[in-house]
């Protein structure tokens, strides 16, 4: 795995690449195009594989839930944009993606994967890296899975909501926090309000 330039609390590495957009068109996009919004950037190993379509379809199907909280979801792999489009145009029953509601970025030169530190160099593919970037472009969360295990859309959505809550209210979110549940005031005395209710 490459070391990369992606660090929690620092600006996420910007990139420019060709993506297949939800309307099926090719477009050059940059991460900086999304400033002012949260971004979930997730990498997957390859098109036309087995775990990947389950993740991509799950994120695409729930993309509106992310948009409602000012967050965009972007998928990326080392495949060409032509390969992405062919996969999108392949029926789901044949292992394809079908219609997409999120852009899929092409990283054929592996520049983005290297910059984000998730390139599996011996195979030239990406690990399952997932990055949550806030509305100022700061990297807030990194998860990297080995190839055989997919990621949870529910957990990703929860994490975005938690970071947005802490940004807005200045309180912190305990383990397993869900929107609407109790948070903790980051103060020795005031935190006791939370702990006295949760033994």
Curated annotation (Swiss-Prot):
The keyword Phosphoprotein does not apply. Its EC number is 1.11.1.24. Gene3D superfamilies: Glutaredoxin (3.40.30.10). It is found in: Cytoplasm. Residues 6-165 form the Thioredoxin domain. The keyword Amino-acid biosynthesis does not apply. Pfam families: 1-cysPrx_C, AhpC-TSA. One of its GO terms (biological process) is removal of superoxide radicals. The active site is at residue 52. Keywords: Antioxidant, Cytoplasm, Disulfide bond, Oxidoreductase, Peroxidase, Redox-active center. PROSITE patterns: THIOREDOXIN_2. InterPro entries: AhpC/TSA, Peroxiredoxin, Peroxiredoxin_AhpC-typ, Peroxiredoxin_C, Thioredoxin-like_sf, Thioredoxin_domain. The enzyme can be inactivated by further oxidation of the cysteine sulfenic acid (C(P)-SOH) to sulphinic acid (C(P)-SO2H) instead of its condensation to a disulfide bond. It can be reactivated by forming a transient disulfide bond with sulfiredoxin SRXN1, which reduces the cysteine sulfinic acid in an ATP- and Mg-dependent manner. It catalyses: a hydroperoxide + [thioredoxin]-dithiol = an alcohol + [thioredoxin]-disulfide + H2O. Transmembrane segments: none annotated. GO terms for cellular component: cytosol. One of its GO terms (molecular function) is thioredoxin peroxidase activity. Belongs to the peroxiredoxin family. AhpC/Prx1 subfamily. Homodimer; disulfide-linked, upon oxidation. 5 homodimers assemble to form a ring-like decamer. Interacts with GDPD5; forms a mixed-disulfide with GDPD5. Interacts with SESN1 and SESN2. Interacts with FAM107A. The active site is a conserved redox-active cysteine residue, the peroxidatic cysteine (C(P)), which makes the nucleophilic attack on the peroxide substrate. The peroxide oxidizes the C(P)-SH to cysteine sulfenic acid (C(P)-SOH), which then reacts with another cysteine residue, the resolving cysteine (C(R)), to form a disulfide bridge. The disulfide is subsequently reduced by an appropriate electron donor to complete the catalytic cycle. In this typical 2-Cys peroxiredoxin, C(R) is provided by the other dimeric subunit to form an intersubunit disulfide. Thiol-specific peroxidase that catalyzes the reduction of hydrogen peroxide and organic hydroperoxides to water and alcohols, respectively. Plays a role in cell protection against oxidative stress by detoxifying peroxides and as sensor of hydrogen peroxide-mediated signaling events. Might participate in the signaling cascades of growth factors and tumor necrosis factor-alpha by regulating the intracellular concentrations of H(2)O(2). Reduces an intramolecular disulfide bond in GDPD5 that gates the ability to GDPD5 to drive postmitotic motor neuron differentiation. This is Peroxiredoxin-1. It comes from Gekko japonicus (Schlegel's Japanese gecko). The gene is PRDX1.
């Amino acid at each position: 795995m490459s070391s990369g330039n992606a660090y929690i609390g620092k600006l996420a590495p910007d990139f420019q690449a060709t993506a297949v957009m939800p309307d099926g068109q090719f477009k050059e996009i940059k991460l900086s195009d999304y400033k002012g919004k949260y971004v979930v950037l997730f990498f997957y190993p390859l098109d036309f594989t087995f775990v990947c379509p389950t993740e991509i379809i799950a994120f695409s199907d729930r993309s509106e839930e992310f948009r409602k909280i000012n967050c965009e979801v972007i998928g990326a792999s080392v495949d060409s944009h032509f390969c992405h489009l062919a996969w999108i145009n392949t029926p789901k029953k044949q292992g394809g993606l079908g219609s997409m509601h999120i852009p899929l970025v092409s990283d054929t030169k592996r520049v983005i994967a290297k910059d984000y530190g998730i390139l599996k160099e011996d195979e030239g593919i990406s690990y399952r890296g997932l990055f949550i970037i806030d509305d100022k472009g700061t990297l807030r969360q990194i998860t990297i899975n080995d190839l055989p295990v997919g990621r949870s859309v529910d957990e990703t959505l929860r994490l975005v909501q938690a970071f947005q809550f802490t940004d807005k209210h200045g309180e912190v979110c305990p383990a397993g926090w869900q929107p609407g549940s109790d948070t903790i005031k980051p103060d020795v005395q005031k935190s006791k309000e939370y702990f006295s209710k949760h033994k």
